[in-house]
Every structure is written in structure tokens, then in C-alpha cells.
């Protein structure tokens, strides 16, 4: 019985080590609320304008990562603090209002946004031989696919 209890304690300590603390959750919530407010206030602005708001949000919640464009990629989250590091995440960003036909949905997975994301991913992996790229995100400011 002591072994099971020790195992549970070890698991709990390990889970606690990776779980965000209450202050981190509060900071994330504050950043997310600020982001949603800015997007709602500027929902008819251009894609570039809204993408800047999204980038600011990402920079607040993802420390020590360089976030910017990379070639034709709307936003790239680099694996390091400079553009010299490899791209780890590709973000295909669409404007909140006015680009609905290009955005993925449950009824339209084969949308322009998805095809662009796949093309950028393949270019990173095949042409640039970037084996560090792990994720792709399609978003229109309010939903993530």
C-alpha cells in the first residue's frame, strides 16, 4: 500500500510541475480578455491589422519565442528568440469579417486557409528541411482549427 501511495504522490508532484499556477492562469485570462476586446473593437479592420493584435497576444502568453512572419507565412512562432531559429508553429490568419469563404469550417475543411497552411508546412519540411516544425494553426481571430 505504501508503494501505491508513493506512486500517487510522485504523479501528483509531476502533474503539479507542468500545470499552470493560479497567477499564470489569471495572467492568461487577462491577456485573452484584452485580446478579445481589441478584436471586437476592430472586427472590420484589415487582416494585417487584426494579425498584429493576435501577434501581440501571442507575445504576451508565449515567452522567449520570436513571433513574426516567415516568407509568405502569416505568422510563425520560432523555436528560439530570433528569426535565425527554425519555425516551430505556422499560423494561417484570416480576417474576422469578410474572409468567411476562405476560412475552414465544419462544412468546408478544404478551404483556402487550410490549403495555404499545408503548402507552407510542406515547404518548411521538404524545401527548408525543417524537422522542428510541429504545429499548424488556422484562425480568424476567434476560432482555432
Question: Residues of each region from the PLM?
Answer:
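A short, conserved, highly charged catalytic patch centered on acidic carboxylates
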Residues: 1-135, 142-143
Amino acid at each position: 500500500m505504501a508503494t501505491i501511495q508513493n506512486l500517487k504522490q510522485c504523479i501528483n508532484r509531476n502533474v503539479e510541475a507542468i500545470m499552470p499556477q493560479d497567477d499564470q492562469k489569471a495572467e492568461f485570462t487577462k491577456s485573452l480578455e484584452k485580446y478579445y476586446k481589441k478584436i471586437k473593437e476592430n472586427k472590420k479592420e484589415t487582416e494585417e491589422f487584426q494579425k498584429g493584435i493576435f501577434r501581440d497576444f501571442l507575445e504576451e502568453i508565449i515567452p522567449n519565442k520570436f513571433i513574426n512572419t516567415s516568407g509568405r507565412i502569416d505568422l510563425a512562432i520560432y523555436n528560439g528568440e530570433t528569426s535565425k531559429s527554425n519555425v516551430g508553429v505556422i499560423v494561417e490568419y484570416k480576417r474576422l469579417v469578410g474572409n468567411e469563404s476562405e476560412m475552414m469550417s465544419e462544412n468546408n475543411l478544404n478551404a483556402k486557409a487550410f490549403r495555404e497552411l499545408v503548402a507552407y508546412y510542406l515547404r518548411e519540411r521538404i524545401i527548408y528541411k525543417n524537422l522542428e516544425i510541429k504545429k499548424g494553426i488556422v484562425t480568424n481571430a476567434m476560432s482555432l482549427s
